[in-house]
Amino acid sequence: MTSESATVIQMDDGRAPAPAAAGAAAAAAASSSYATAPTSISAAEPAAAPRKTTTVPFLLRSGAEGFRRCLAVIDFLLRVAAFGPTLAAAISTGTADERLSVFTNFFQFHARFDDFPAFTFFLVANAVAAGYLVLSLPFSVVVILRPNKATGGVRLLLLLCDVLIMALLTAAGAAAAAIVYVAHSGNRRANWVPICMQFHGFCQRTSGSVVATFLAVLVFIVLILMAACVIRRSK
């Protein structure tokens, strides 16, 4: 009895490679989807968010506008500083009054500011200057808030008024300084004796008023130079 070994040969009917082909197709599709994924993601990205702007204080802004604004702030502070000396000079001169009794109270010498026309003019000039400085503060604030070329007319107006007030204070201070000098030193040729040896309080008040007035004149000079510089740069 012979046994024959049966050999089984599997026939390829075209169905067996189907799973492999399907796997290859899926891999190709996945790779293609991965390749195109960044493009679709990048296309779907929203627009770039706006950058956050940091607010810079208006005093620190660079350029011509910041320069003009800084000078405007200094202008405001100088006007406030000049108001004190002019007001103090006016009050000190207006209250300069001293009496000197000789032997009895019925025989007295009197020294008062209105006895000298120069001191009267001096008092009025300082009062006008103090009032002007107060009235000019709102205009100075406008220049601070709007330091552009549109406020050139305001700057020019302040410049002209500053020049007039400086000239007024200079004239009044010079006239009062001459009287104070004569009161301290006298004049031998004219036979004018010094009176400050007797009227100490009167001379101290008037002398201090003259010094305060010339300090205000210096402040006005600085204001005029600053205003002229700004107007020159804005053209």
Curated annotation (Swiss-Prot):
It comes from the Eukaryota. The chain crosses the membrane at residues 71-91, 119-139, 163-183, 211-231. It is a multi-pass membrane protein. It is found in: Cell membrane. Coiled coil: none annotated. One of its GO terms (cellular component) is plasma membrane. Keywords: Cell membrane, Cell wall biogenesis/degradation, Membrane, Transmembrane, Transmembrane helix. Residues 92-118, 184-210 are extracellular. GO terms for biological process: cell wall modification; cell-cell junction assembly. Residues 1-70, 140-162, 232-235 are cytoplasmic. Belongs to the Casparian strip membrane proteins (CASP) family. Homodimer and heterodimers. Regulates membrane-cell wall junctions and localized cell wall deposition. Required for establishment of the Casparian strip membrane domain (CSD) and the subsequent formation of Casparian strips, a cell wall modification of the root endodermis that determines an apoplastic barrier between the intraorganismal apoplasm and the extraorganismal apoplasm and prevents lateral diffusion. This is Casparian strip membrane protein 2. It comes from Sorghum bicolor.
